[in-house]
Amino acid sequence: MAGLLLAGCGQPAGIDGTLVDDWAPLAEPKPFVPPVGVCHPGGLTKVAPLSSFDPVDCATGHRTETVHVGTFAEGAAGRVAPPGEGSPEIRTAFGECDAKAREYVGNEWRGGRLRLGVALPSPEAWTGGARWFRCDMAELTSVERNGDVVSRTASVRDALKAPSSLSLGCYSVRLAPDRSLREMPGVDCAKAHNSEFVGVWHAPETGFPTKDLDWIRLYAECRKLMATYVGAPNDVNLQFRADVVVLVAKPDEWQGGDRGVRCYLWLYQGTVSRSVKGAGLAALPIPRR
C-alpha cells in the first residue's frame, strides 16, 4: 500500500510540476458600459447605477430609451468623481447627446414632443473606472406646458424622419387676463388655430436669458425662422403681421447645455384652418387695430 501511495505522488511523463505557468493570463476586468437602443421602465434620471439597469423590450411599455452612449474625454475622465450638474464636462456631453439624438430620431428632436437627458455612472462605478455617459430620450404629453412622460410601446428610432404623431404642429394659444400666455394646447392644423411650430434656433454659449436684451435676441431669431416657414420677407412689417412664442429649456437644463430654442408663430387676431407654411404674406395680413 505504501508503494502505491508513493507512486501516486510521482510526476507523469511530460509534466513539469508547475500547474499554472502555461495558463493564459486572466483578462483585466472592465467596467460595465450600457448598450444603445435599449428601453427602460423608469423615467429620465441623472444617475444610472448598475443596480437599476433593467432594460425591457421597446415594443412593451417603457418610459425612456437610450439613443447614444459616449465616453468622457481625458480631462473629465481624470476627475475623482463624476462631473457636477452644469459643469463644462456635462455641457460637452449634452452636445454630443444632442447631435446623436438627431441622428437617432431622424430629424431635429426638438421638433417633436421629446426630451433628452444625460445619465452618469454612480460615484461607486466612477471610482471603479466607469467613464461613460448615457443619452436617454422620453416622450412627453406636451413640451409647451411641462408635460408628463408618456409610456411608449415603440422605439423612437427614426420616429421624426417623416411627420408623425410626435411632431409639433398647430396650437390654440390662449391668453390670461394680463395678456400673458395661459395655455397652448395642440390642435389639428385643419381646424381653427392661431399658432404653429416653425423651428428651432440653437443659441450660443451664453447665460440663461433673464434681461430684456437677452429675450430680444431670441425673439429676433425666432422671427427669422417664422419668415422662412411662411415664405415671407423678414422685414420691419413682419412683427405687425404675427408675433412669436419662444420656448427655452429650464435654467438648469440651459446651464447643462440645452440651448435649443423652440419657436412658434402666433397670429395676433383671428384663426386659420390650414397651415400657413409656405403660404406667403397673404397668410399673414396686418391686423386692423
Tell what function each PLM region has.
Residues 1-2:
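Sec-dependent N-terminal signal peptides
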